């Protein structure tokens, strides 16, 4: 019986997770398999416990997409990207409305997976050597609040809030009231759940909306921040312009922007391949350079107060891509993809959910390489001020 199972399933697993069988022969592979088995076990248990308050977290339901539609929606996402004449992979062939819809689709598909595998802060951070990953994430969030000059009682905008952990951190540390905006309705539901659980209802309020056309009046907020979110805008000027509009005169806006650095060479084929992978695997309409990000803010009227790569600022902090590299080296990425395939086959996940796991997982080695080569940073820190009237 065992021989028959091996004969039937080894080729399937090898097809979707190359190197899996060989990897099992190493001690790291064994550890990774145990981790994936544990994840799969929790997925199954939580899937069966329909009364669980976090069933969507571990059930990997596809967010706002119905289970029966996940396969179709994943295919639509895949076909949304097209290569430009220079080989870059962008959504330029889509209009603004269609581009926003693609980003919404992306977060419907990946939010549960992000929360399950990465926690409630959907961003990277350099890690001081005396801290763990979770502490490093909070320190990274606290810094953006400090750079935006946030004070107690301020009305603050978290632009592209995801499921809200940065906004909750800033609100809890500063005493400000933070309003977060995300394009994805499912993320609002997750944010509300975690905000109530943290006892921060009233200090952090998530709303659903397009950050290139925000439902807020002019001069509403005393400060604003964004963490690895405005990269999802069709054009940076569109989101920066809206932030400028809703800020009061004299207010500060701090952002960790995902951009290519001056080490990126558009004539280097490998560089372009890496950036294409990041664009596709992260739901980004287009990748901008650090210079384009600076110019975008100036074009809408902001005064640039400071700008630097927060990921390269410290010579002693562990790099922002460290955790992803560890996940790859320890086999967590490979075996999680295989676990999703197995759970999909058992109909414990939406049909073809493995496509989503592969969409994100396949880009992770390129993400690490982008950091190691220095051609990309997800945290180019820009601090802007809206001029006084």
UniProtKB/Swiss-Prot annotation:
Membrane recorded as keyword: yes
Question: EC number(s) for this protein?
Answer: 2.1.1.-
- What keywords appear on the UniProt entry? Endoplasmic reticulum, Lipid biosynthesis, Lipid metabolism, Membrane, Methyltransferase, Microsome, S-adenosyl-L-methionine, Transferase, Transmembrane, Transmembrane helix
Which top class of enzyme applies to this chain? Answer: transferase
Name the GO terms of the biological process aspect. Answer: methylation; steroid biosynthetic process
CDD domains in UniProt: AdoMet_MTases
Location comes to: Microsome membrane
Q: Name one GO molecular function term.
A: S-adenosylmethionine-dependent methyltransferase activity
Residues spanning the membrane: 25-45
Q: Gene3D superfamilies, from UniProt? A: Vaccinia Virus protein VP39
A GO CC term assigned to this protein in UniProt: endoplasmic reticulum
Topological relation to the membrane, as annotated = Single-pass membrane protein
PANTHER family, A to Z: 24-METHYLENESTEROL C-METHYLTRANSFERASE 2, PTHR44742
Q: What does this protein do?
A: Unable to convert squalene, botryococcene, cycloartenol, zymosterol or lanosterol to mono-, di-, tri- or tetramethylated derivatives.
**Family of the protein in this entry:** Belongs to the class I-like SAM-binding methyltransferase superfamily. Erg6/SMT family.
This protein's name: Sterol methyltransferase-like 2
Organism from which the protein derives = Botryococcus braunii
Q: Which gene encodes it?
A: SMT-2
């Amino acid at each position: 019986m065992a021989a028959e199972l091996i004969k039937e399933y080894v080729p399937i697993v090898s097809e979707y997770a190359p190197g899996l069988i060989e990897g099992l022969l190493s001690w790291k592979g064994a550890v990774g398999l145990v981790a994936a088995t544990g994840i799969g076990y929790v997925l199954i248990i939580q899937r069966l416990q329909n009364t669980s308050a976090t069933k969507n977290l571990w059930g990997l339901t596809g967010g706002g997409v119905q289970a029966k539609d996940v396969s179709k929606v994943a295919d639509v996402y895949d076909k949304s990207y097209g290569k430009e004449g220079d080989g870059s992979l962008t959504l330029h062939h889509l209009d603004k409305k269609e581009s926003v819809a693609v980003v919404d689709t992306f977060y419907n598909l990946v939010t549960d997976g992000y929360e399950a595998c990465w926690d409630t802060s959907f961003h990277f951070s350099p890690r001081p050597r005396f801290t763990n990953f979770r502490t490093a994430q909070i320190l990274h969030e606290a810094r953006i609040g400090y750079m935006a000059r946030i004070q107690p009682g301020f009305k603050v905008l978290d632009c592209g809030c995801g499921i809200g952990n940065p906004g909750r951190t800033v609100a809890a540390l500063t005493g400000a009231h933070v309003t977060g905006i995300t394009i994805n309705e499912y993320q609002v539901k997750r944010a509300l759940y975690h905000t109530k659980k943290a006892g921060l209802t009233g200090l952090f309020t998530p709303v659903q909306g397009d950050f290139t056309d925000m439902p807020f009046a002019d001069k509403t907020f005393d400060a604003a921040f964004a963490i690895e979110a405005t990269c999802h805008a069709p054009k940076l000027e569109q989101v920066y312009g809206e932030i400028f509009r809703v800020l009061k005169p004299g207010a500060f806006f701090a952002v960790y922007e995902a951009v290519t650095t001056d080490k990126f060479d558009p004539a280097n084929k490998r560089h372009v391949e890496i950036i294409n992978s990041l664009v596709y695997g992260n739901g980004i309409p287009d990748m901008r350079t650090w210079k384009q990000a600076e110019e975008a803010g100036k074009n809408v009227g902001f005064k640039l107060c400071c700008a630097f790569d927060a990921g390269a600022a410290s010579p002693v902090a562990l790099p922002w891509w460290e955790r992803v590299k560890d996940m790859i080296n320890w086999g967590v990425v490979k075996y999680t993809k295989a676990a999703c395939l197995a759970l999909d086959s058992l109909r414990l996940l939406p049909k073809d959910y493995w496509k989503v796991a592969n969409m994100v997982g396949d880009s992770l080695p390129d993400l690490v390489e982008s950091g190691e080569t220095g051609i990309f940073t997800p945290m180019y820190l820009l601090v802007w001020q809206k001029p006084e009237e």
